[in-house]
């Protein structure tokens, strides 16, 4: 303990480098160490101490003041806390120089029986600081009474309580501190710290002693006296009459000191040079530090956190705290830690962001400025605007009409994320029916949201000042309502017509524990993102300046997503979303399903060894005659990367005896198997003189297109894929498809009737395209095989007739025909 106290005292010394060097060199001198030891022994010698007190007494008597040194005799010790920060000890001591206690009879208060009014003289010494075992400092005060007072306290319990209360009150009034009376405890020890004598100064009746005649004055004047000289005519100091004692009441539990710190997580994307980049004013965590200097263990404390209220109760010592927090917190994820060295309870509480934004948005911030002619304010309480108030704008003499689509907050929504239906409300003539439980993901219900985005509300949200919400997509557990301004319907504004959402171009890559979605749409408005995440699917809708988009992503039952909030990064040209895989589904997945909604999903394959082999088998496979046998083709994989696959296939046998041997077949795909938004098929046929040759390209620019592949025994195929260009709009191109002409013998072998069938590709019927020629695709066999180039699935069709656009690419081909 002495070592710790010495080290703490040395740490408090403010020494310069020169002083440290001089002290170091001095203590290295043996003569200096001997002299320093003699000095320490001299000042600690009791005899020298007595001589020092006699000299001080004589000097003070010459000044007309009687000085008496009060040496405290041990009594008992009170332990409490000082200003709620650290421990404090009050030594209740005795000395015969202090006045004896006295009492006088007096009437009781409030109709109580008559009693005795006590007067308890005491002497105080300034507080002294010591260092504890852990380096923590504590303060010690000495309150000295007459020995008779301590004798009465030992024999009467109520008198002892009065004596202790008087000692604590004297320290508070004299030194201006606050002691914890409720948790004051009497220790078994008799004295704490090192005893130090106090001084009692009383003026002498005769005043200052006159200087004798003939005595020369001193060369130096007396040093200034630090205390005020009392008048000689005044009598000796009397103990002030103590006020009438108050009714003895047990004090209330002590309210400990506490501090609340708001902790934010720094994210560099909040400091980009962009309108949507702004740090949120809502903190991520609240750190509450509670000072409990008398609490030895956290087992005696009871902590409860609910919503925005923190409650702490403790018995022995008695603490009671009711703290109102600035933000609602998630008590289920909070943690508390008690620091025994500092006697502090540190509680870390994550802020419930969704509830905090809703509470902040509903809190009035004073009178809002009137805008427009209707003076109606529409409040948005969702992830679109974080937490801020919006003023609705309207133009013209007529009052604008408001329509809001409001979803229940997270507290009223079900676990599956269903929306609780609300009754219809009339907002100035435009009534909106709430969405039902199963209508939240259909494109028809999303059209109202997109029409509101087109009216300029989404852009205005980013421009308004205030608290910006996180750009993270809300999960099914944190669904919040959005309110959109659709005023101007009577004026023929852009909000009068609902825009059907489009399916955006999407690329999906994977690793062992996450999926990365690349949405190649430029100009995405961050505040328009609305997502719904579940273990088996992910739905997202957003909008740009000109249009709205929506897509649904699903996976196999054995592949599950984590419900962790997705990470979203938005740039000027695209958006990247990272979805975490569930821990039990880590690894490489085989396929994924994607489409505009759940009714139009398509299967997509990830790039792995199994899918590549299956794709190669589908490419080289053709519906040949059973009697015709081909040698296995020579397949050579030139390059397999994330962005490109190059395959070289060489056939060993051709049905045409005059044809070329060893025809080469090249397959090149410039994008992953999962990215087949735009595919281009080129077919080149070489046959005898009775056959015609046609070269055409089939280009499909749609979200759910299906490519037709018709096998011919002696026709090599070249498949090439092109990455979707990131333009906002592209004019649809004509669909061109070729069919080979067959010889007369082959036409006679056709036995099955031909059935006309129209196929809808990209939303347009082929029959509606200009310059179309109906061509019957006939073959030697009863069936034909249709291969979907997007997922490799094969469909067998017995009777099939297709309508296609027929176009010649070369004038020589036209002459040959």
UniProtKB/Swiss-Prot annotation:
Keywords: Cytoplasm, Phosphoprotein
Composition bias type Polar residues, residue spans: 681-692
One Gene Ontology biological process: cilium-dependent cell motility
Primary subcellular site in the record, as a coarse category: cytoplasm
Keyword Repeat: no
GO cellular component: ciliary basal body; cytoplasm; cytosol; dynein axonemal particle; extracellular region; Golgi apparatus; nucleolus; nucleoplasm
Extent of Basic and acidic residues compositional bias: 386-401, 661-680
InterPro entries listed in its UniProt record: Kintoun, PIH1/Kintoun_subfamily, PIH1_N, PIH1D1/2/3_CS-like
Spans traversing the lipid bilayer: none
Positions carrying Phosphoserine: 622, 631
Region (Disordered): 233-259, 385-404, 410-445, 473-503, 653-692
Compartments, as annotated in UniProt: Cytoplasm; Dynein axonemal particle
Cytoplasm is among the record's keywords: yes
Recorded superkingdom: Eukaryota
Similarity field: Belongs to the PIH1 family. Kintoun subfamily.
Quaternary state and interactors: Interacts with CFAP300. Interacts with DNAI2 and HSPA1A. Interacts with DNAAF4. Interacts with DNAAF6/PIH1D3.
Protein function: Required for cytoplasmic pre-assembly of axonemal dyneins, thereby playing a central role in motility in cilia and flagella. Involved in pre-assembly of dynein arm complexes in the cytoplasm before intraflagellar transport loads them for the ciliary compartment.
Name of protein: Protein kintoun
């Amino acid at each position: 303990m002495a070592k710790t106290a010495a080290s703490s005292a040395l740490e408090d010394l403010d020494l310069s480098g020169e002083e440290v060097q001089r002290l170091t060199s001095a203590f290295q001198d043996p003569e200096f160490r001997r002299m320093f030891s003699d000095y320490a022994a001299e000042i600690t010698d009791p005899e020298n101490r007595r001589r020092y007190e006699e000299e001080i007494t004589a000097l003070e008597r010459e000044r007309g003041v009687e000085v008496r040194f009060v040496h405290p005799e041990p009594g008992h010790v009170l332990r409490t806390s000082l200003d709620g920060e650290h421990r404090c000890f009050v030594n209740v001591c005795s000395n015969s120089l202090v006045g004896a206690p006295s009492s006088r009879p007096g009437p009781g208060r409030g109709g109580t029986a008559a009693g005795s009014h006590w007067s308890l003289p005491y002497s105080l010494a300034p507080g002294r600081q010591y260092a504890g075992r852990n380096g923590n400092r504590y303060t010690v005060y000495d309150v000295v009474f007459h020995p008779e007072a301590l004798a009465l306290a030992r024999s009467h319990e109520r008198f002892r309580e009065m004596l202790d209360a008087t000692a604590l009150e004297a320290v508070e009034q004299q030194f201006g501190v606050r002691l914890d009376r409720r948790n004051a405890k009497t220790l078994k020890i008799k004295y704490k710290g090192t005893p130090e004598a106090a001084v009692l100064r009383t003026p002498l009746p005769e005043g200052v002693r006159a200087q004798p005649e003939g005595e020369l004055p001193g060369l130096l004047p007396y040093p200034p006296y630090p205390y005020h000289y009392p008048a000689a005519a005044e009598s000796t100091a009397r103990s002030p009459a103590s006020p009438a004692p108050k009714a003895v009441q047990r004090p209330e539990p002590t309210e400990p000191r506490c501090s609340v710190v708001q902790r934010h997580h720094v994210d560099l994307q909040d400091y980009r040079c962009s309108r949507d980049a702004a740090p949120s004013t809502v903190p991520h965590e609240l750190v509450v530090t509670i000072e409990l200097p008398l609490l030895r263990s956290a087992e005696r404390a009871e902590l409860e956190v609910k919503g925005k209220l923190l409650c702490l109760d403790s018995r022995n010592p008695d603490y009671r705290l009711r703290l109102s927090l600035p933000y609602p917190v998630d008590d289920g994820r909070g943690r508390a830690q008690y620091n025994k060295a500092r006697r502090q309870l540190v509680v870390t509480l994550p802020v419930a962001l969704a509830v905090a934004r809703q509470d902040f948005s509903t809190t009035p911030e004073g009178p809002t400025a009137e805008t427009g002619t209707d003076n109606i304010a529409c409040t948005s309480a969702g992830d679109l605007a974080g937490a801020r108030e919006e003023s609705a704008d309207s133009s013209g003499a007529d009052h604008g009409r408001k329509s809001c689509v409001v979803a229940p907050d997270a507290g009223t929504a079900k676990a599956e994320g269903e929306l609780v239906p609300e009754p219809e409300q009339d907002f100035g003539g435009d009534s909106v029916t709430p969405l039902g439980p199963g209508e939240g993901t259909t494109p028809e219900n999303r059209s109202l949201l997109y029409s509101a985005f087109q009216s300029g509300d989404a852009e205005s949200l980013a421009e308004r000042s205030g608290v910006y919400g996180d750009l993270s997509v809300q999960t099914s557990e944190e669904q919040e309502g959005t309110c959109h301004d659709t005023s101007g319907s009577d004026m023929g504004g852009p909000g009068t017509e609902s825009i059907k959402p489009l399916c955006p171009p999407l690329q999906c890559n994977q690793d062992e524990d996450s999926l990365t979605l690349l949405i190649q749409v430029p100009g995405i408005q961050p505040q328009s993102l609305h997502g719904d995440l579940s273990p088996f699917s992910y739905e997202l809708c957003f909008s740009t300046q000109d249009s709205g988009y929506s897509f649904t992503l699903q996976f196999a039952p054995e592949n599950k997503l984590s419900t962790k909030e997705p990470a979203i990064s938005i740039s000027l040209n695209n958006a990247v979303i990272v979805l975490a895989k569930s821990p039990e589904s880590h690894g490489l997945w085989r396929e994924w399903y994607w489409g505009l909604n759940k009714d139009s999903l398509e299967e997509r394959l990830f790039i792995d060894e199994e899918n590549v082999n299956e794709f190669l088998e589908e490419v080289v496979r053709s519906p040949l005659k059973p009697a015709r046998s081909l040698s296995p083709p020579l397949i050579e994989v030139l390059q397999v990367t994330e962005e490109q696959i190059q395959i070289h296939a060489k056939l060993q046998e051709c049905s045409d005896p005059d044809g070329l041997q060893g025809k080469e077949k090249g397959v090149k795909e410039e994008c992953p198997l999962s990215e087949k938004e735009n595919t281009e098929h080129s077919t080149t046929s070489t046959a005898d003189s009775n056959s015609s040759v046609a070269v055409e390209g089939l280009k499909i620019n749609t979200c759910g297109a299906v490519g037709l592949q018709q096998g011919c025994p002696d026709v090599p195929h070249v498949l090439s894929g092109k990455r979707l260009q990131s333009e906002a709009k592209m004019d649809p191109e004509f669909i061109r498809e070729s069919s080979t002409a067959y010889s007369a013998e082959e036409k006679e072998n056709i036995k099955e009737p031909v059935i006309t069938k129209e196929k809808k590709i990209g939303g347009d019927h082929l029959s509606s395209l200009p310059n179309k020629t109906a061509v019957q695709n006939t073959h030697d066999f009863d069936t034909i095989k249709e291969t979907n180039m997007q997922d490799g699935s094969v469909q067998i069709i017995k009777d099939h007739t297709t309508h296609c656009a027929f176009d010649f690419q070369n004038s020589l081909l036209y002459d040959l025909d």
